[in-house]
Every structure is written in C-alpha cells, then in structure tokens.
Amino acid sequence: AGVGRIGLIDNEKVDLSNLNRQIIHKTSSIGRKKVKSAIDSAVAINPEIRFSPYSKKLNKSNAISIISKYDIIADGSDNFDTRYLINDACYFLEKTLVSAAILGFDGQIFTFRPRGPCYRCIFSDPPKENLIPSCTEGGVLGSIAGIAGTIQATEVVKELLGIGRSLSSNLMIF
C-alpha cells in the first residue's frame, strides 16, 4: 500500500511452532532471527519496501525511542506485558495504535487513537499469571492469525489515509 518505512521489532528466532500462524517464515527460516527472516521474505515480494529492523526485545528503556519514530503502531505481540508497554508508550506519545490479539479460534482488533480510549481503558490490569494460556499452551488456528493480520493491516491503511470506517472506539471480536 506504500506506507513508507516499516519498523519491525522482535527478539526471537523462528521456531517450528511459529510456522502455522506466521506465514512470512518458511521451514528454512527455523533458527533465524524473526526480524531478518520476515524482512527477507517481504523484500523478495517487493524489493522497494523499506524496513528499520530491531532484533531486540521491546522494553521500558527503548519503547519511547523506537515508537516515537513511527506515525502509527501495529501491535501483534503475544504477551500482555508487551501489549501494555506498547499501549502506554502510544498513549504518552499520542500515537495511533492498531492492536491485534489471537488465541485458539478467537481474535480481537481495536484501533486506539490519541486522546481516545486506550488498551488500558478497556483492560485496566493484565490478567493474573497463568490465567490465560500462551499461544503455545492454548494453541492458535493459523487462519485466525491471518484474519487478524489482514484486518489489522486494513485498519492501518485506513488510518494512514483517513478513509473508511475505523474500528476506533469499537472492539472487534471474532
């Protein structure tokens, strides 16, 4: 869609268990850094894409400096600590956040605009530890990740271009 520069952050390496829901990676990518694998796959499709890779964990020390460089943030993280950290940084920096989360057969998408309701407004506190299973424990149907990612990407484009009906102030659950 021609969005300019894309920042991609992940500190993990591709694992066999990722392949059913992270189709940007191939079997030959197992053991490679996820950021490098994803960029290589995307550039193979469109060599004009520009990326800023961050092969590190997002944390309290680097979240503001990384997130401040982008107009809109798309969060597909798989843990609550990271979701809340991204939300808090976006809230502080007044950045639009498009959040996507999945587990099992379910997904949720929400667009949080500056000065509007935020992730913490809906989910004030992270769930107690071990209350909600991880993707590895609870499983994820691969097509659910694809649906969530497609809707999330569409929301990002709508927000960047100021077109269409946004999910802002509406939590989509499927």
Where is each model-derived feature located?
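Adenine nucleotide-associated cytosolic modules
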Residues: 1-174
